[in-house]
Curated annotation (Swiss-Prot):
Protein name: Putative ankyrin repeat protein FPV012
Keyword Repeat among record annotations: yes
InterPro entries assigned to the protein according to its UniProt record, in alphabetical order: Ankyrin-EF-hand, Ankyrin_rpt, Ankyrin_rpt-contain_sf, PRANC_domain
Record organism: Fowlpox virus (strain NVSL) (FPV)
PANTHER family listed in its UniProt record: ANKYRIN REPEAT AND EF-HAND DOMAIN-CONTAINING PROTEIN 1 (PTHR24127:SF1)
Short name of one Pfam family: PRANC
Keywords: ANK repeat, Repeat
Ranges for the ANK repeats: 11-40, 44-73, 77-106, 110-139
Coiled coil: none
Repeat recorded as keyword: yes
Length: 331
């Protein structure tokens, strides 16, 4: 390996950093293949991964990490690649970095976490992404002799960061019901105490509790919407139920201003299966090995009864086979 190529040039930048900044993936791969260290920083402490995160070059990000780039490496001013992507508002880059092992709860030397940076820059879509990917809203941050939670950090800055702080409250409220609460109960209690000191935050928290109560009174079979959507317990539910209850699910979602988003998954599942069923009843033949019937002679109810026993993949297979037959006939 050419040590000169691996080190910092006279202008203070490494060759790999400069090629990354240009977006020259061919040259980046060539340098990495020759053994250039992807973690060598410039004189300003920024590495190739930091600039790749800033420019949102996903292909180069993946290559750098594949060749050993430290995904949580900090700059002198405390920035990791994930913090940079949050600042730029690039959700795709955030998602890739999380896929590649970036820690959603990483605490830098200044006590800044990804959630803190999200609140500071008001990134609501990235907030949801991080919460879905394991960010801990009840994390107790330790810096020297000082400890604090995210609500304690921002409570005196409420007027400056009002909307993003309000957006975090619903996640804190439902975190009480997650399995991880057993190890985060102190952080949860400290967050709740901070929320209780602010009338606006408390108002949102009470609305959250009201919506959770509503979700316990609606459901499918013996499972409430709270269990299905908040606890994400859908393993024993027949997916045909999402079709049968689709209109009621949509109606219930319209009553949930805060937690309505938690119903998106099951409503989409219901809509998708309904579309498949509607397409499948119109096919001219049914040649799945599991079925032995004169398909065209069956009434609509009989077809739906048969289709309801099939999973989505088999229904798609039925539709595809019919489409192929039609094309062969017309061809």
């Amino acid at each position: 390996m050419d040590t000169e190529m691996d080190g910092v040039n006279n202008d203070g930048y490494t060759s790999l950093y400069k090629e990354t900044a240009k977006g020259n993936i061919k040259k980046v791969v060539e340098l990495l293949y020759k053994g250039v260290n992807p973690n060598t920083p410039n004189v300003d402490s920024y590495t190739p991964l930091h600039i790749a995160a800033k420019t949102g070059n996903i292909k180069i990000i993946r290559r750098l990490i594949r060749y050993g780039a430290n995904v949580d490496k900090e700059t002198n001013d405390g920035y990791t690649a994930l913090l940079i992507a949050i600042c730029t508002g690039d959700i795709k880059t955030c998602n890739v970095l999380l896929d590649e092992g970036a820690n959603p709860n990483y605490v830098n030397k200044y006590g800044i976490t990804p959630l803190v940076r999200i609140i500071s820059y008001y990134r609501p879509t990235i907030l949801k992404l991080l919460m879905d990917r394991g960010a801990n809203c009840n994390q107790i941050i330790n810096i020297g002799q000082v400890t604090y939670t995210i609500m304690e950090y921002f409570i005196n800055l409420f007027d400056e960061y009002k909307i993003p702080i309000l957006n975090l409250v619903p996640y804190i409220i439902i975190s009480k019901f997650k399995a991880s609460i057993t190890v985060n109960i102190e952080g949860f209690n400290r967050n709740i105490a901070a929320i209780a000191k602010n009338s606006r935050l408390l108002e949102v928290a009470l609305k959250c509790k009201s919506e959770i109560a509503f979700m316990t009174t609606r459901g499918i079979g013996d499972k409430s919407l709270f269990e299905i959507c908040i606890l994400e317990d859908i393993k024993d539910i027949d997916h045909n139920s999402f079709v049968a209850f689709l209109d009621k699910l949509i109606e219930s979602q319209s009553n949930l201003r805060i937690y309505g988003y938690t119903m998106n998954k099951i409503i989409e599942m219901g809509r998708y299966r309904k579309e498949l069923l509607c397409s499948a009843v119109r096919v001219n033949s049914c040649n799945l090995s599991s079925l032995n019937t004169e398909w065209c002679l069956l009434p609509l109810k009989g077809k739906l009864n048969i289709l309801s026993k099939l999973n989505n993949d088999n229904i798609k297979k039925l539709i595809l086979n019919d489409a192929i037959k039609v094309n062969n006939k017309t061809g």
